[in-house]
Amino acid sequence: MMRARVPLLLLGILFLASLSASFATSLREEEESQDNPFYFNSDNSWNTLFKNQYGHIRVLQRFDQQSKRLQNLEDYRLVEFRSKPETLLLPQQADAELLLVVRSGSAILVLVKPDDRREYFFLTSDNPIFSDHQKIPAGTIFYLVNPDPKEDLRIIQLAMPVNNPQIHEFFLSSTEAQQSYLQEFSKHILEASFNSKFEEINRVLFEEEGQQEGVIVNIDSEQIKELSKHAKSSSRKSLSKQDNTIGNEFGNLTERTDNSLNVLISSIEMEEGALFVPHYYSKAIVILVVNEGEAHVELVGPKGNKETLEYESYRAELSKDDVFVIPAAYPVAIKATSNVNFTGFGINANNNNRNLLAGKTDNVISSIGRALDGKDVLGLTFSGSGDEVMKLINKQSGSYFVDAHHHQQEQQKGRKGAFVY
């Protein structure tokens, strides 16, 4: 009897051991994923909504599902659209305000209005200062064309859902990938609405024989020419005078604020070895998307998801299609490990300020000065005297983007510093 129990006991021990190991592995993976709640790796953070031989649509996972620290972004989503040359994204509407930024290629965007009205926009990434962008009001039917015969089109969209944090796209077309939303209406509703027999409605709108392979389809070059005429003749006025551009031989930053959406759009280009010096935004929560290249980023914030007087550095190695979130008031520095460019969206952009912590100009530390009855506030703030602090600051003759080729990065542990209320 005892002999029979021994194998069972061993099996039980082995089962518990494997269960414990599995739990430990799961816990470790969860802890690792929480090590940097601001970093979204392109390999596992994008969810594909549609894909065929002509392109794809994919959406980044919800920000607030990654970390409670990002719960203020629960009403914002990132969407990426890519399409091959001479293709059309079929007409649709979404339950979200959309802000489109063209990152490569060119596009013809058509907004459909009531009473047979349409607005045409020709958008391109060729603008040397800033890629074209366009706002699409929620519920507006629109379609997109890639008119270029050779170059792929890539668009990044900031979506602001109006119903709930999920985005719902409503396509009129019935394709192999999905049904037209009109098909969900009952037979008698459709017949009364179109004043036609259901058989005719089904043949004209929904019949499988005429269906496309998906929501991204090939388009005839003659149709593209006709659309291009409308788009170029109706092209909107340049907004370049509203741009705020700063740059030097190491990098360029261009920003533009859409006051109606309270959103900042930014474009950052950096040469390999360049450093965007430590800085922070006063109000805006910035969502950075890597378009091309690689970079090392360091963000300083409170340690852990709690009120604390300790802070730590959240570091990440960024590459193409990665996303990084920079909360308001969190200092950040970016070093280009190759030529790199980003698209940024800043939430809460109205009355936002960018504050630099190093460099010759716009440096808030050097602005502290002497304000307490003539006393040296800088000297009280740091271990050195105010003169020593200013001497240190003035050693850097560059601003915003500086050369970091010859400076090695040092690892630092978290220490007490920022006050969190």
From Swiss-Prot:
Protein keywords: Glycoprotein, Seed storage protein, Signal, Storage protein, Vacuole
Q: Where is the signal peptide?
A: 1-24
Q: Name one GO molecular function term.
A: nutrient reservoir activity
Which InterPro entries does this one have? Cupin_1 (IPR006045), RmlC-like_jellyroll (IPR014710), RmlC_Cupin_sf (IPR011051), Seed_Storage-Functional (IPR050253)
**In what residue span(s) does the Cupin type-1 domain sit?**
237-390
GO CC entries: aleurone grain; vacuole
Q: Which residues are glycosylated?
A: N252, N341
UniProt key word Glycoprotein = yes
Asked if the record carries the keyword Zinc, the reply is: no
Q: Which family does it belong to?
A: Belongs to the 7S seed storage protein family.
Function description? Major seed storage protein.
Subunit description? Homotrimer that associates to form a dodecamer.
Q: What is this protein called?
A: Phaseolin, beta-type
What is the species listed in this Swiss-Prot or TrEMBL entry? Phaseolus vulgaris (Kidney bean)
- Give the taxonomic lineage as stored in the record: Eukaryota, Viridiplantae, Streptophyta, Embryophyta, Tracheophyta
